[in-house]
Amino acid sequence: MGLLLILVGIGGGLGAMSRFALTQATASISKQIPIGILLCNIIGSLIIGMMAAFLIQTKLFNEDISTYVRSLFVTGFLGGFTTFSSFSLDILNLLQRGEALLAISYILVSVIVSLIAVILGFYFIMGIYR
């Protein structure tokens, strides 16, 4: 457990630094659309899909090594880079199980409730500082 936490921490730090670097590098492209975050979400989703398929399809990783790879890259790096990638993988898993209605519901609830949470959190703090 200790080594896994260290791997998650290292990966998370690298992912967060990568997200910061990408958002800074793309900040001048558009002031209206957060291009950097959009790219992080898309790139993170691409990487998590590739990692999931790679870990499933190859015999290079046994269960123990796979746990370390997931901890460093998926939970750590991609968790620091974006959490949207995990959300996207969850949706893919639902679709692969033939649960399209549940996947659509999950998308709608996640996006709507997350947006509501952001709005509530924003206005709660704004109210404190009035």
UniProtKB/Swiss-Prot annotation:
Coiled coil: none
Ligand binding (Na(+)): G79, T82
Family stated for the protein in its record: Belongs to the fluoride channel Fluc/FEX (TC 1.A.43) family.
Keyword DNA-binding attributed: no
Keyword Metal-binding belongs to the record: yes
Name of the protein in its database record: Fluoride-specific ion channel FluC
Organism for this UniProt entry: Francisella philomiragia subsp. philomiragia (strain ATCC 25017 / CCUG 19701 / FSC 153 / O#319-036)
GO molecular function: fluoride channel activity; metal ion binding
Topology within the bilayer: Multi-pass membrane protein
Protein task: Fluoride-specific ion channel. Important for reducing fluoride concentration in the cell, thus reducing its toxicity.
Swiss-Prot/TrEMBL keywords: Cell inner membrane, Cell membrane, Ion channel, Ion transport, Membrane, Metal-binding, Sodium, Transmembrane, Transmembrane helix, Transport
Regulation: Na(+) is not transported, but it plays an essential structural role and its presence is essential for fluoride channel function.
GO biological process assignments: cellular detoxification of fluoride
NCBIfam families, sorted: crcB
Lineage: Bacteria, Pseudomonadati, Pseudomonadota, Gammaproteobacteria, Thiotrichales
Sequence intervals crossing the membrane: 2-22, 35-55, 72-92, 107-127
Catalytic activity: fluoride(in) = fluoride(out)
Any one GO CC term of the record: plasma membrane
Encoding gene (name): fluC
Subcellular compartments: Cell inner membrane
Database matches in InterPro entries: FluC
